[in-house]
Every structure is written in structure tokens, then in C-alpha cells.
């Protein structure tokens, strides 16, 4: 009987946590609808608000998802299932935003976004990432589950379990793979593309999560590990900001310069 009560309590906490994340998604969605209606003739302000709300939603849900996954050590597939599901949710609800400075950088380098618009989106992501800490802190202070009470302090939990060069390689490689897929899946049907990207993100988290957390998103990393940035800024700056940016740069160089050059050389050699 005691075991059943403990299991029931665990299920209640899990359902409450899932409900909290879905509520954040719903409220952010309603705010986006209002923003679209009110700011149709101000593209900069419109882009800022949408990017802010998208980053806020992503960071808040990831805070709660990380907390929930830490409480289920006996179910190794449970966190991955949640990651896949909420990646689908974000993919369906955050259309037109990136919630990732690396995504903005990629669009600017490929000529798909002006520097001014890029700066506005980056600022929105920064504010959204920092604002999510206050938002999720206020929600946790309500003590809706037993997990929230013990996690409200946002103490630094260093996710880097390898030395610095390996951590840089992991984050750069994750960023390279994800954004390469993002770039090359443009022609895939939207419904299928969302599932493919969700599966890819889940795989990357599974492969690199135990090494660095496999964040490959500077804004999300700042929100999740703000205290760690304060205590070991240089290490976290290199791993979570520079490394994903390096992955983007390598991806651009490969697909925009190296592969076309290789193809042209091959074509010339065949003609000769």
C-alpha cells in the first residue's frame, strides 16, 4: 500500500509538471496571437516579440523538462520521450522563429536576414533567456510539486563531464549536424521535417547529453547554466557560445564553399 501511494504521488507530480509545461506553451501561443494582431505594420517590433516569446517558451519548458528528467533515473527512455514530444510541440508552435542565436547567425551569413533584424532577434533571445529564469523561478516558488521546492535556488550544476577540448568538439559537432539538417531539410514536407528534426535532436541529446548536456544553443545554455557562467565564465563561454558558433561557421564553409568547389573541380576533370 505504501508503495502504491508513493507511485501515485510520483505520477501526480509528473502530470503536474507536464501540465505546467503545456500551460507555458499555451500562454505563449496566446501572447503570439495578440502580438500578431497588434504589430502587423511594425516588422522589427513584431519580430522582437515573437522571438522573445519563443525563447521564453523554449527555456521555461527545458528548465522544467531537465528537472523532471532528473527525477526519473529508473526510466532511461522517459527523458528522451519527453524531449522528442516537446521538440515536436516547439516545432509546431514556434514557426518563423529560431530561439537560437546560431540559427540567426546562419541566416545572416547566408544572406537571408539583414544585420539589423538579426541584432533585434539576438537581443530578444537574450532577454527571453534571462527572463525565463525569473518566470520559472516564480512558478517553482508555488511549490506545485515536491521537486520544485528543492530546485528553486538555480544552483550551478556543471554539466561538462569531459575536458575542455572534447566539450568544444561535442557542442560544435552537435551544432554542425543540427543546422546542416535544418538547412538541407527545407524541401522536405513540413510535417515530416518536424519529426525528422525532433528525432535528430533526441539522438544528439542521447549521444552528447552525458558529456556536455548537448545544448548547442547559446541562449538556452545561458538560461540553464547562468550561475555556472558567473562562476566559470571563460569555460562556459567557450563551450556553449563559441563552440556552437564554430559549428555554424564550419557548416557554412562546407555547404557554401567547399562542396561547390569540389563539385566544380570534379565536373571540370570529367570534361577534360
Swiss-Prot record:
Residues 1-14, 69-75, 189-195, 257-272 are cytoplasmic. One of its GO terms (molecular function) is glycerol channel activity. Keywords: Cell membrane, Cytoplasmic vesicle, Disulfide bond, Endoplasmic reticulum, Membrane, Transmembrane, Transmembrane helix, Transport. The lineage of its organism: Eukaryota, Metazoa, Chordata, Craniata, Vertebrata. It comes from Equus caballus (Horse). The gene is AQP11. This is Aquaporin-11. Channel protein that facilitates the transport of water, glycerol and hydrogen peroxide across membrane of cell or organelles guaranteeing intracellular homeostasis in several organes like liver, kidney and brain. In situation of stress, participates in endoplasmic reticulum (ER) homeostasis by regulating redox homeostasis through the transport of hydrogen peroxide across the endoplasmic reticulum membrane thereby regulating the oxidative stress through the NADPH oxidase 2 pathway. Expressed in retina specifically at retinal Mueller glial cells. The chain crosses the membrane at residues 15-35, 48-68, 76-96, 168-188, 196-216, 236-256. Belongs to the MIP/aquaporin (TC 1.A.8) family. AQP11/AQP12 subfamily. Homodimer; disulfide-linked. Homotetramer. Can also form homomultimer. GO terms for biological process: endosomal lumen acidification; hydrogen peroxide transmembrane transport; intracellular oxygen homeostasis; intracellular water homeostasis; negative regulation of epithelial cell proliferation; negative regulation of ERAD pathway; positive regulation of cell population proliferation; protein glycosylation. Not glycosylated.
